[in-house]
Every structure is written in structure tokens, then in C-alpha cells.
Amino acid sequence: MSKVVYEGWMVRYGRRKIGRSYIHMRYFVLEPRLLAYYKKKPQDYQVPIKTMLIDGNCRVEDRGLKTHHGHMVYVLSVYNKKEKSHRITMAAFNIQEALMWKEKIESVIDQHQESQVPNGQQYVSFEYKSGMDTGRTASSSDHESQFSAAEDEEDSRRSLMRRTTIGNGPPESVLDWTKEFDAELANQNSDNQAFSRKHWRLLQCQNGLRIFEELLEVDYLPRSCSRAMKAVGVVEATCEEIFELLMSMDGTRYEWDCSFQFGSLVEEVDGHTAVLYHRLLLDWFPMIVWPRDLCYVRYWRRNDDGSYVVLFRSREHENCGPQPGCVRAHLESGGYNISPLKPRNGRPRTQVQHLIQIDLKGWGAGYLPAFQQHCLLQMLNSVAGLREWFSQTDERGVHTRIPVMVNMASSSLSLTKSGKSLHKSAFSLDQTNSVNRNSLLMDEDSDDDDEFQIAESEQEPETSKPETDVKRPEEEPAHNIDLSCFSGNLKRNENENARNCWRISDGNNFKVRGKNFGQEKRKIPAGKHLMDLVAVDWFKDSKRIDHVARRKGCAAQVAAEKGLFSMVVNVQVPGSTHYSMVFYFVMKELVPGSLLQRFVDGDDEFRNSRLKLIPLVPKGSWIVRQSVGSTPCLLGKAVDCNYIRGPTYLEIDVDIGSSTVANGVLGLVIGVITSLVVEMAFLVQANTAEEQPERLIGAVRVSHIELSSAIVPNLESE
């Protein structure tokens, strides 16, 4: 193998013949004359899945941002202009990685072009500008492309417009306010230092932001349309990190944008342009003022100086009509300008400008100045939210997601549909993302390709290898086991608002150790469970309840009759009345040599050093959430655990009362247990690279448990 210029995990992106897109992880290797990718990191002389010869005729086409099942990826296409049918399309979950690959590939292409100059075979040099000076034209090189060979002239013009990160340029209806501002900057001189005061005045300083108002009066806008206002602030993060966060409309947005209630993708026009639906949360006398929503086109580009521009303007769309219970506001102009500043004390700094000119419509917008002012300031304060989010967050590798607006794109949507149904769909966002995270994708290049989970591969690409290199029976899906024969006295209910019930938690709600955790200290979403949770019992008695797996007719006994292995976790709650919540996890068989098998058949010392619990409290008072926390805990080190190894099961009796600290937390929890929703994940801690990544034994969510629903079990020995 020749010298490697650059290598690493990237996403393969494309569309199948039926038009459905696909993405999956592949290991890309760039050499001085070759670009290739493999299913996994190549060893020795492994044959790649696909290769492309790199020479001076090759080009890197930036296709911008694409959405697949709510996951946004940044797409590059590498091709030879003499043979356009042969190309490699690659993508990354973050724009930094995509730009790094683009730079590396273009540097290799440039070296080949320079080497051809002495021979008289000169290639056109493509040093692309941002397109700021030429309007809709990407660069002067695009004009030179018109003189290429006749057979590829049309395709060349079409693709060269996409080779920079500006796409086709903003739609004609979208006002590029950043372009006008830059032009004014270029024209200013030392005698006109107050040029900015001609158009903007400082209105106030709030939350560390400077709030400006445009001075220009316009006659063509309605009275209810505000003057343009902008907020300017500094965020300690890179332009790329801020840009990726701005482009997302998932649950993370609630943490920094106080005016955001719900957002969704209506149409993806191209890699730089999309139509979005956005419902605002303005919280101004909601009993008398209806909520506002928007349908707008969003365009973005990256400039040569590393800055980003995101532009908004309202538009009508056939799949995004007016919604019952909402007033459709009109966004005359708006967006973000994200510009890099010099680092300070080793920390990146970025100036963020957020501009809004909006007509809120409705009866109150033109006659209640306080309403207009309140709403504008609330939206502009998102810049302060960005600043605080980055200052308080260590994890920067968040995946941006935009849920596809299924309901609005459907022809079955009726304007007479109640506002309640739309409200319900808006708050099913987390459920939608949960399904998206669990979707499995396959490669069109191989019918027997290995599956992987997006959420894991985004964080740590190599974490998919232990799950894909070896097919384990313990990873078989749940539908291979008939779950209908198992039952417990606590009922299962998938309804979000159900009470006194349980359901299986999404494994991706929990972070576990990824591959090479010892070196990189990186955690990943847990993904699929190793075992199936088939039943939950809720018991009470005057004494502590031990060894429940011996009870005739319990789920562990039913599993044994069917030749299945079960793990029983008995969480014992002390008090004047002793309670036990018992979870029954089932699988077909233990895999010899696996970490789970070594845990089941190991001694108590090994088990105590490895059994781990990850708690979550999605619903509950602040003090309970703080007391319980979400930090993983080695159960055997924190409380007393009694292990009972039966022929076809392992029971773990967890005595919460054996720990003073746990007892204190329990005192808080028991008093408000009916108002709590608690999630618990059980796993075996993986300490070495061979054991990693960690896998959940199982996870459960219990909701609003009633103490009175517990029953006294019959534990008479057979």
C-alpha cells in the first residue's frame, strides 16, 4: 500500500433505483493517486469496495446538506470530468470533517495539476470564492468551464455551480442582508466612521447582547410588520459548531431557543436550500393571543473566510397550508451571520448576528407595540441562548436532526383537522427521533452487508465493528421470541401518559462506553438490548422478598419451560412494608466466552465489580432528579447484591436498604413515587477494548407507580 494522505470513517450517501436514500459507514483511504473505501479499516492488501483514480481532471463537488430520516449529513461528490458516470459520493455528520476531506482531496488534485504544467497540459485551477461579488454566479472559474469539451459542457456547468459551499445561490425572493452589509463595509473610509449609524441604531443591551434597530423607513410594508432588528453577540465556539446547532430542529433546540415550539422539514430543494415549518412559542397572553407559525425558505452558504450565512424568508407551499389554531406570520427577512473572531486564551470565539423583520399578523400585531417588542426580543435572545448553551456544554458532537413533516406532506391533511391533533404531532418529536435512531440501513453494494445503528456510528465509527464483525445469537431481534406467554402483575402500556405501568426504554436514551473508551473516553448511545424485558412484578410483604425466581408460574419459570435463559433483577425497597419490583429479562441462550456469559457464571466478586445501573428521571421534581441523577453506578459497590444462579436463570436481589445514601434518596422518591417516571438500564461494565463497546442487558421505564397496586406473592418452595 502506498503512502496514505488521509483516512478515516465517513458516510456513504446515495439513492437507490426506487429513489429512496441510504447512508452507512465506510472507511475511506486517500492516497496520492487513489481514493478508495472499505467496509472496515483495511488490513494488509485487502481489496476495497470501490476505488477512483485521482488526477488533474478530478473535481470535488460540494452538494451541501442532505437529510435522511431526520439525520443531516454534509455531502461531497468526487468525480472525473472526463468520466462523470464514475464518482464516489461521501458525507459526514459534521461539516468540519467534510471540509477536511474536501481540502485533502483538492490538495492531491492540485499536485497532479501542477505536475502537468511542464508538459504543457495545463488544467484550470479552481480556487473558488464565496460568490459574494458575483451574485448568483459561484466564481469566475464557472465561466471558464464553458470552454471545456462539448460532450461534458452542460454537466460541467451544472456541477461547477455546486463545487463551492453556496449551492445555486439564494432564491431570488430571499433578501441577502449580509451582502448589503458587506458592501457597505467595503465602501467605508476613514472619513466616514459613522457609516453604520446611517442604517442601524443601538436600541438596548440585554443578556450580553447588543440589540439594533434599522432606521430605514419603508412604505410598502404593512403596519403590523416590524422594522428590522438584529442581535449581536459573541459565542465561545467555532463557526462550524454554531452552524450545526442552528440547523437542527430536534430536542436540543429547546435548550437554547426559548421561542421554539416545533419545527419540521417540508421540502429539501437542494443541499443549500430547504422549505421549513416552524411554530413559535411567544408566550404573550396566550389566552387571548393565538400562537404564530411560519413556513419559510432557508438558504445557507459558507464563505471563504470561514463564516456562515443562513437566510430566511416566508413563502407559501402546497404541503404547508395554514394550521387551525395558529396565525401564519410572515417573515419578511431574517437569518444568521456567523463570523470567526480571533481566539482568546486558547478558546475559539465567534460573532453571531441574528436579524429578524417579521409581520406577526393577527389583530394585535399592528395595535399593540408591546406584543411586537416582546416577541422580537424573545426571538433575538436565541443568540444569548447559544452563548450559554456552549458555555455549559462539554459534548459538542451532537447530531443535527430535522424531522420530516409527514402529516403536512400528506394529501390527507385537511384544514378542518383539529388543532389538538397538530399539537399532538408536534410533541411526538422525541418519539420520531427515537424511531429514526433505531433504523437499520444497508449498503446497495452488497446484499449481505452488515447492519449498524446510526447513533453509534456517528459518535464513534469503529463502535459498529464489534456488533458487525461477529454475528452473535444474543443480538437476535425480539420478535424471534414469543412474548405473549409472559405476564406480570404490573401491566405494560406504551401510552406516554399512562399510569402505574411499564414499557421498554429506548436504548439510545443511555450513553455507554464506546470502542477504545480507555484511550478516548468517549461514550455512545447504547442501541439495541441484549435481552428482552418480558414482564415486571410489583410485590409487597411484611418481610424482605428474596429469590422470587422460584415462584411457580413466574416469567423465569415460563422461560425455563421454553428452553430460554432469563435474568431476574429484584429491586428490594425496605420499610414498614417491604416492596420489590422484579424485572424479567429473557434471551435464547448465552454466548460462550461473551462478557454476559462470564458475568452470569462468574463469582460474586466479579459480578459486584461489573454490574452497572444507569438511572434517568424524565418526569419528577427538581430535587428528585438531582438526587437520583443520571450517573452510572456499580450496584455491587453501592449496595448489597445477592446472586442466585439457577439452572436456567440468574437472579440478582438488590437490597436498596443496605446503603445509607440510597436509603436517603429512597425516602425522597417514595413520598412522590406516583408523580415520577423513572428509567433504568442494566448492563455489565466493559473494562477492556476487547469487551467494548458496552451493551445493555435491558432497559425499562416505569411510570407513576401506585404503592397500593403491589400484591403479596406466594413464594412457597416447590
From Swiss-Prot:
Bilayer-crossing regions: 664-684
Basic and acidic residues bias (residue ranges): 462-479
GO molecular function: phosphatidylinositol-4-phosphate binding
Organism: Arabidopsis thaliana
Name this polypeptide is given: Protein ENHANCED DISEASE RESISTANCE 2
Record CDD domains: PH, START
Cited SUPFAM superfamilies: Bet v1-like, PH domain-like
Annotated segments matching region Disordered: 134-174, 437-483
